[in-house]
Amino acid sequence: MAAPEHRTEKYARVSALEELLKDLNSNLAGANENYLKDSDERFTKIFLMGPHRSGSTLFLQWLANTGLAAYPTNLLSRFFGAPLVGAKIQQLLTDPRYNFRNEILDFNSEINFSSDNGKTKGALAPNEFWYFWRRFLPFDELDYLPGPELREKGDLAGLRDELNALANIFEKPFAMKAMILNQNIPELAEQFDKSLFIWIRRDPIFNIQSALEARKRQYGDINTWYSFKIKEYPQLKDLDPLESVAGQIVAINRSVEQGISQLPDHKKLVVQYEDFCRRPKYYYDEITRRVRDQDGLGGAAAPAYAGESSFSNTNIWRLEEYSSKDAAGAYERFQII
């Protein structure tokens, strides 16, 4: 088993909450099975891929705000073991269609564009939903398995059916982060006829800086590995922090590029974070076109775009331990390996 994490107090897990959720989800498992009867594939699943700290949280918050797709919320994440039950409860508590005389109006339905190491605030704000993914993936020391082994030991059919059923409950495409399978994209893609893989890339210099800053926030130093343990983890984990993170970003981008290379154009989209910040509507149009090409809207029309016209990106060098030139050099060294 992997070694225990030593998080800073702010990011430490709450053991009482973990136990409560484990008990709740275990007892709801049977009810969840009943909702799996409607798991035909009618809507597109939108998977966000790429390195951590590349802008994926902002992108998912933005996409959620457009109304095009449903997504895992902080409320839904509490039901990681019984998400179909959770989806029904979320509808009951938050969907205006089921509002009775304004009895329950306490849930925050607004989604802002702030986050902290991928974490958001608000019942209906997007959640990373990693506990859900791990139910189906037999990862241990590494967050990766060779394709044949993952197909044999994982429950990819179960993952497929629950995601299809979730989309059917919400009657929309379902969008979510899927970086836990950055290095197993073909195995995920083969589960769906209607899927869109979005590779979010960021200027690698600032991606490296942001990843190092995330280490410091999460663990109190820049030496401790942060995010999924990719297949290159054993070779990268004990390097100088800058080299470790640079190698991590290069390896992830390389894996995603290879993973989507065999997908048809209507099943993939490359998003450059800096360009997305300049013109988000362009990417909304690209997404909706691909979803329509898959007949992934269930016969409905895509909402007209009413979102942000632009975002400010955070590409300013702040790190004291290294310079931007150091980061560029480290990235280039791994690029040629």
Regions found by a protein language model. Name each.
Residues M1-D40, K216-I337:
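PAPS-dependent sulfotransferases, especially Golgi type II membrane carbohydrate sulfotransferases
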Residues F43-K45:
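Pre-Walker A (Motif I) flank of P-loop NTPase domains
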Residues M49-G50, K177:
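The Walker A (P-loop) glycine that initiates the GxxxxGKT/S ATP-binding motif of P-loop NTPases
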Residues R53:
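Walker A (P-loop) phosphate-binding loop of P-loop NTPases
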Residues R78-A175:
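PAPS-dependent sulfation machinery
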Residues P173-K177, V270-Q272:
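Short catalytic-loop micro-motif centered on adjacent basic/acidic residues
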Residues K177-M179, L188-E213:
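Conserved phosphate-donor/acceptor-positioning beta-strand/loop module used by diverse small-molecule
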